[in-house]
């Protein structure tokens, strides 16, 4: 027997309903249809609100980028071949007001420049967008925001396509010999608001436009197999098939990090980097052990984010045990903090270290702790 755990009541009800019809079993569930209608209306309202808000926000970002970077972009040489690094920028990613410090790739840019490469960075801004754009404008490094390369016309066309798109699986999808097609379609119909991102889709246009302007021999990006990544890679390969894409896995990979574990169907239909570099050999083994056979080459590499640890002295273990609680950048993480503190606060032999996510500092969740 197989067990599928479903944490949404309305989806569970709908699956039982469809199963009952198939097996000619009477199914009685008071107010199921009413709940479904209410849920559908809620989903539609939230979806349109999210898309319109995203559309307006992107329009603002596109024109803000063009206001600051239009002349700078015109003066950038298009004859050189660049190593392009796709990274991120926070408000704290700057020193001396005129230098950008890459929070994910450290000194990689400086190393490549020393080795006679032309380097350009393109970043997603996380935090106060206008403040970050102003700081990017004043720095010495060649760094551009992703939104600079998005066409307003493409934004409008993509927006119309997304709001009229109906997500539906047409083929039978099996997991452990169980047909999950109906489940997936029910999920998609009620979670469209969470599954579609206008910004993620537009990474195709952004990277495609950039690679039509600038020549690139190598494109380097973070690699977590997030939704924006295949759109980014598709845009690059469409504009410049010869560009080699290197995905740098930059953090811990556990046995339940399923976003890293791709099987044959996904590998066949998903654009991936030409090579994936991991943080050390252990991470490499975990990904290889849980992936299909046609996965791109995986190489063990260094931890660029943690270069500062080379300066640290080795610390010997103490009797007091430490537990590191690394938080995600989502609002509900306070529940994890509360759980850990409640369970372990009375144990004097354990020290709890809480590491907040860069986009969600403790100051934003401490009211719930």
Give the location of each predicted region.
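Catalytic-core helical/loop segments in enzymes performing group transfer/polymerization on anionic/lipid-linked
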Residues: 1-369
């Amino acid at each position: 027997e197989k067990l599928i755990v479903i944490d949404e009541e309305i989806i569970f009800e709908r699956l039982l309903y469809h199963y009952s019809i198939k097996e000619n079993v009477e199914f009685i569930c008071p107010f199921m249809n009413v709940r479904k209608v209410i849920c559908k209306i809620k989903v539609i309202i939230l979806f349109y609100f999210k898309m319109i808000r995203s559309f307006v926000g992107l329009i603002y970002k596109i024109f803000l980028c063009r206001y600051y970077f239009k002349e700078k972009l015109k003066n950038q040489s298009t004859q050189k071949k660049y190593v392009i690094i796709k990274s991120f920028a926070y408000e704290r990613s700057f020193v001396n007001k005129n230098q950008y410090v890459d929070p994910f790739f450290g000194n990689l840019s400086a190393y490549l420049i020393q080795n006679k490469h032309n380097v350009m960075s393109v970043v997603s801004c996380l935090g106060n967008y206008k403040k970050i754009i102003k700081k990017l404008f004043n720095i010495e490094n060649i760094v551009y925001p992703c939104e600079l390369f998005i066409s307003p016309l493409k934004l409008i066309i993509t927006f119309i396509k997304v709001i009229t798109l109906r997500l539906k699986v047409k083929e039978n999808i099996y997991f452990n010999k169980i047909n999950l097609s109906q489940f997936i379609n029910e999920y998609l119909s009620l979670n469209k608001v969470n599954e579609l991102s206008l910004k993620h889709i537009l990474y195709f246009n952004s990277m495609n436009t950039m690679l039509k302007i600038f020549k690139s021999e190598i494109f380097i990006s973070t690699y977590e197999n997030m939704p924006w990544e295949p759109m980014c890679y598709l845009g690059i390969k469409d504009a410049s098939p010869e560009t080699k894409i290197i995905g740098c896995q930059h953090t811990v990979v556990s046995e339940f990090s399923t976003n890293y574990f791709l099987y044959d169907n996904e590998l066949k239909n998903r654009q991936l980097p030409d090579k994936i570099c991991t943080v050390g050999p252990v991470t490499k083994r975990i990904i290889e052990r849980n992936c299909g056979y046609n996965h791109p080459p995986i190489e063990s590499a260094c931890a660029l984010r943690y270069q500062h640890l080379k300066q640290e002295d080795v610390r010997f273990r103490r009797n007091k045990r430490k537990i590191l609680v690394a938080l995600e950048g989502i609002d509900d993480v306070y529940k994890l903090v509360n759980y850990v503190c409640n369970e372990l606060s009375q144990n004097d032999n354990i020290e709890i270290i809480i590491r907040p996510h860069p986009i969600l500092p403790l100051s934003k969740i401490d009211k719930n702790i």
